[in-house]
């Protein structure tokens, strides 16, 4: 199931539908979230959507959701290398930390995204960045038995 997000237009439309179908009801507006269209585009690997969104809202490149994840975290989690390239070209912070201190390299290593790990390392991601529990990307790759990622991280000086 896809994660819901509310754009201002969609929110206005849903409110209008509720008003029409529920005359006299007490309306509670939808809970606003920090999850925006750019996060959905990154999650889906929608390069066209990312490009269009960033052309209109360049500051959104490092916009965080409720969990502190940037669009780059989400692209890395889902192995969307082309989306990550767009985000990095537009100034995404390669070592941004989400809640818990995880970086895009952490989530790519945990997911076993070999091409993403290679891209992030080539672009300068810190191979030994530690999360709030002291874990490194190599710790995550080892825990999740991502053997190819383990080899790549070790070749780049990764430590546990």
Model-identified regions with their sequence ranges:
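Ankyrin repeat A-helix N-terminal signature
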Residues: 40-45, 74-80, 107-113, 140-146
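Ankyrin repeat structural motif
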Residues: 46-54, 80-88, 113-121, 146-154
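Bacterial N-terminal signal peptides that target proteins for export
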Residues: 2-13
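Intrinsically disordered, low-complexity regulatory segments in ankyrin-centric signaling systems
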Residues: 5, 24-56, 160
């Amino acid at each position: 199931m896809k994660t819901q997000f509310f754009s201002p237009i969609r929110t206005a439309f849903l409110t209008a539908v509720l008003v029409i179908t529920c005359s006299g009801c007490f309306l509670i507006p939808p809970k606003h979230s920090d999850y925006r269209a750019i996060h959905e585009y990154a999650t889906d690997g929608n390069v066209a959507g990312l490009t269009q969104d960033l052309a209109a809202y360049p500051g959104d490149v490092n916009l965080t959701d409720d969990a502190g994840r940037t669009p780059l975290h989400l692209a890395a989690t889902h192995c969307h290398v082309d989306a990550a390239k767009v985000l990095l070209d537009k100034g995404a912070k390669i070592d941004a930390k989400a809640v818990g201190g995880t970086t895009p390299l952490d989530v790519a290593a945990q997911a076993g995204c070999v091409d993403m790990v290679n891209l992030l390392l080539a672009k300068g991601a810190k191979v030994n960045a530690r999360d709030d529990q002291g874990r490194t990307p190599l710790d995550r790759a080892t825990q999740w038995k991502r053997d190819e990622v383990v080899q790549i991280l070790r070749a780049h000086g990764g430590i546990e």
